[in-house]
């Protein structure tokens, strides 16, 4: 059977679907926290994204504790509890093989805050207002015709 070269293309539908299933299972396991390390028990952890490798053997889990405090400590604790979390994912998701879990800091909130700060800068706000006024003027001209 011939394999396709997928370099340059995004994740497959299967990778996206399995990633979402793993994300839900992991978030549920972290929310319940039944068998977790006591240091993690009181921490609320969000899992906004899980990216699967093409062979579905590795799940890269992007996590962020609520409030963004002690991120590195939380990631180290999650990595230390990886075997237990993997078992919890296996109980909740029916897969041929359970992926290995890797934990990384989620930077999407930081990126969103950075973009928001850029849009609030006076020079950018001025440019946006100028574009809005120009668009409104062109619509008025079209209506008069």
UniProtKB/Swiss-Prot annotation:
Biological processes per GO annotation: maturation of SSU-rRNA
Subcellular localization, as worded in the UniProt entry: Cytoplasm
Q: Where is this region: Disordered?
A: 126-145
GO cellular component: a single term: cytosol
Give the keywords, sorted.
Answer: Cytoplasm, Ribosome biogenesis
Q: What is its main location?
A: cytoplasm
Q: Which GO terms describe its molecular function?
A: ribosomal small subunit binding
Name the PROSITE patterns for this protein: RBFA (PS01319)
Write down the superkingdom of origin.
Bacteria
Biased composition (Acidic residues) is annotated at: 130-145
- State the oligomer form and interacting partners: Monomer. Binds 30S ribosomal subunits, but not 50S ribosomal subunits or 70S ribosomes.
**What is its biological role?**
One of several proteins that assist in the late maturation steps of the functional core of the 30S ribosomal subunit. Associates with free 30S ribosomal subunits (but not with 30S subunits that are part of 70S ribosomes or polysomes). Required for efficient processing of 16S rRNA. May interact with the 5'-terminal helix region of 16S rRNA.
In the record, the note on similarity to other proteins reads: Belongs to the RbfA family.
| Protein name per its UniProtKB record | Ribosome-binding factor A
> Whose protein is this, by species?
Azorhizobium caulinodans (strain ATCC 43989 / DSM 5975 / JCM 20966 / LMG 6465 / NBRC 14845 / NCIMB 13405 / ORS 571)
């Amino acid at each position: 059977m011939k394999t396709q070269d997928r370099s340059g293309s995004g994740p497959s539908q299967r990778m996206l679907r399995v990633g979402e299933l793993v994300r839900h299972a992991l978030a549920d396991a972290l929310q319940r926290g039944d068998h977790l390390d006591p240091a993690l028990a009181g921490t609320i952890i969000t899992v906004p994204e899980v990216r699967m490798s093409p062979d579905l053997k590795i799940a890269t889990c992007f996590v962020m504790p609520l409030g963004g405090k002690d991120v590195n400590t939380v990631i180290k604790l999650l990595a230390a509890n990886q075997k237990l979390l993997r078992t919890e994912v296996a109980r909740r998701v029916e897969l041929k093989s359970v992926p290995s879990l890797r934990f990384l800091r989620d930077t999407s909130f930081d990126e969103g805050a950075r973009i928001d700060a850029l849009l609030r800068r006076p020079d950018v706000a001025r440019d946006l207002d100028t574009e809005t006024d120009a668009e409104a003027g062109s619509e008025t001209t079209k209506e008069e015709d």
